[in-house]
Amino acid sequence: MLSTSPRVTIPDVTITDYVLRHAARLGDKAALIDGPTGRTLSYRQLADGARRTAAGLARRGFGKGDVLAIYCPNVPEYAIVFLGVAMAGGINTTVNPLYTADELAKQLRDSGARLLVTVPPFLEKAKEAAAQTDVEEIFVLGAAEGARPFTDLMQAGDQPPAVTIEPAEDLVALPYSSGTTGLPKGVMLTHRNLVANLCQAEGMRNFECFGERDITMAVLPFFHIYGMVVIMMLGLAGGGTILVMPRFDMMEFLTLVQKYRVTILPLVPPIVLGLVKHPAVAQFDLSSVRLTFSGAAPLGEEIARALSTKLGCPVVQGYGMTEASPVTHLSPTHDEPFKPGSAGKIVPNTEVKIVEVGAGGDAELPVGKEGELWIRGPQIMKGYLNRPEETADCLDRDGWYHTGDVGYVDDEGYFFIVDRTKELIKYKGMQVAPAELEALLLTHPAILDAAVVRKADEEAGEVPKAYVVLKADDASKATPADAIMGWVAQRVAPHKRIRHLEFIDQIPKSASGKILRRVLIDREKSS
């Protein structure tokens, strides 16, 4: 099935050129505002900062194909770093700011990062992680004793290096995703992937995209593809203002929406639920909001309708994944039926077909029939970094990306996601790979075997639940569940913590030794 929106022309330019296309004209207009402090970066400062960053990187020998890791919460300078690296021909690998030093080190090693940018509160963790890798230098946004400030990098002038970038071939972003299965993997995204996705959102029929008069809330993290592309890149490309929050706090969020007259709220379902239920919402003037957009995880129809009524504006969903840069579907904002609970319609220049799960064929199923979504378009990744087999498992020779998500399309072209075949857990829209937690659990001295599955949760959407087989000795058998969960919590980022644990005599497995997760998920649902 093809998109019903008109095809869009995708220019053969870099992501920096596309995002900063209006910067000279917009000049002193606020591009990004730091919500807690009010500190502002204008479009002129953003463009100048990106050029100076590129020049400074080049002077240090950082060039085409080199990787820089960004280990920061949301700050206005995030955009300067990202666009400066892109201008230098480099690749940004964006890291979850909640990662432990060990988790950070894994991504630094896997991505081959040469440089690391962080903030003062994260410096010690960054140093600990970098010491285990080939990272050559750490830069800090701000001041920290014994650290090189990022501003040092910007003293090499404002002439970026003359780098030849092939937008369709050269990588610019390397976010990490668990994909349909296994451990987090580097997703290779080119300049063209990102530019295409911005053009697709801007060209979507009956979707009022971000414009120059919009003020967009950026509370969702920039390290995540949703925050990186849908909020930061799309908002700046449209010439609007991005209001940046480093972390979510309901009262501060509401205060900032009211103070700055925010017009667009890109959210995830847990925040949508909070806005529906929190009594303080009624105390604030949120009438400036014209559009609320929910992504990263499914949003229930009743919750969407409730927030739409409360705010007096559309609450629409989209659908996508890191591997698609990320958007493949958007819900119309006007002149078409409002269907809460739908993932929306196909964006321009994109094909989608629904295929019978596990059938081994590629025949497209009819309208209303549930199956796995396959997607093809210019926004689809090049593949997973250094993982050709895992790339081949999900990206076929004809260019179709097999999402692992199960859904159907209705007779008006609206898609609905109902289940997924892939293993990953979505905690507040953030990915948790069961295999990663299982590998960690198996290093616990009392554990013989373990499996991790998703458990439904009203607030978080899903949380990790572990099924654990203890070793036979008396000491191991006496190990309480809370002790194991606490042990895991000390070793992983907060969103990966195991929230429920059940002891079991045996982990169900296939003849080849593969964990039968569906058996455990069904057991969980019936309990």
Each predicted region: which residue ranges?
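A short helix-loop-beta submotif of the ANL/AMP-binding
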Residues: 66-67, 73-93, 97-101, 106-115, ...
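Conserved AMP-binding/adenylate-forming core of the ANL superfamily
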Residues: 31-75, 79-83, 100-105, 151
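ANL superfamily adenylate-forming
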Residues: 121-168, 183, 278
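Conserved AMP-binding/adenylate-forming
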Residues: 46, 240, 292, 299-316, ...
